């Protein structure tokens, strides 16, 4: 094309193969390997230990990449698989974290013409069901706040996160952990969702943010009718258990949800947590 007003010339490349609109995602793929996240998923998650199909690493990494790409629903994962350039990068990356027999199976599938390089929405939904314990639903009482007990796979996810926190602390040591604790009201139109205090159906996860490291230390997904202060002591205790080595001082920041006598007394009693002393 001829040069216009600006000193720029445009050239049309007839070869469209390998183009991608997701050029930033491979950096996160590399980070996942460097941080040991891929290895942590493989060593801790056991959803797909037995059986054919997508491995734990493939599904979890696909979901992470989907969130980074701006996906808002499981169905959006199809957009990743439709990006030819990204798929080529993903295929090469997948071979790096697979075991030998898994690598052979995947290469054999590609030779046979298998097109999918990311799990389908159906496969992802089937995978996510493993983190739901239907038996826990029998414990619900209408009109009361209820938090299901995490099943085995949810506990395994926590161990994956623990490994990532250890990596961050090793690269950027912090002796202080200021834990910002607050709930986030997330509106939803899901039929089974419950109403929040704001008057609409929502979910209200309780999050613990590690201010010095700039990341989520702990989170608990909750129904919309569960108050932020409900069992806040237990959540903070679980967050403390995730702190990696090297942390010597802990502070907790909260809104009125944290103004509970039991909670405040526990933080002030250094005998309850001698490794950190009084928690401010």
What label would you give each PLM region?
Residues 214, 221-280:
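An internal, acidic/charged active-site-proximal segment
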């Amino acid at each position: 094309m001829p040069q216009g007003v600006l000193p720029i010339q445009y050239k049309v490349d007839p070869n469209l193969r390998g183009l991608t609109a997701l050029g930033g995602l491979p950096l996160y793929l590399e980070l996942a390997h460097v941080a040991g996240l891929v290895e942590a998923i493989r060593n801790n998650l056991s959803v797909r230990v037995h059986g054919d199909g997508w491995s734990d690493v493939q599904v979890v990494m696909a979901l992470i990449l989907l969130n980074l790409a701006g996906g808002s629903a499981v169905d959006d994962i199809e957009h990743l698989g439709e990006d030819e350039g990204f798929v080529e990068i993903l295929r090469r990356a997948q071979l790096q974290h697979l075991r030998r027999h898994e690598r052979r199976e995947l290469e054999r599938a590609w030779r046979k013409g298998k097109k999918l390089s990311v799990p389908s929405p159906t496969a992802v939904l089937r995978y996510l069901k493993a983190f739901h314990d239907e038996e826990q639903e029998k414990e619900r009482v209408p009109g009361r706040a209820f938090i299901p007990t995490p099943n085995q796979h949810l506990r395994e996810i926590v161990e994956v996160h623990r490994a990532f926190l250890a990596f961050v602390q090793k690269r950027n040591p912090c002796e202080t952990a200021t834990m910002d604790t607050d709930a986030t009201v997330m509106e939803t139109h899901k039929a089974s969702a419950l109403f929040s205090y704001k008057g609409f159906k929502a979910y209200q996860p309780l999050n613990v943010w590690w201010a010095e490291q700039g990341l989520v230390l702990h989170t608990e997904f909750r129904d919309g009718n569960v108050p932020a202060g409900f069992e806040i002591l237990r959540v903070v205790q679980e967050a403390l258990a995730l702190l990696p080595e090297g942390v010597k001082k802990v502070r907790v920041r909260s809104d009125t949800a944290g103004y509970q006598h039991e909670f405040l007394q526990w933080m002030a009693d250094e005998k309850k947590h001698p490794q950190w002393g009084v928690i401010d």
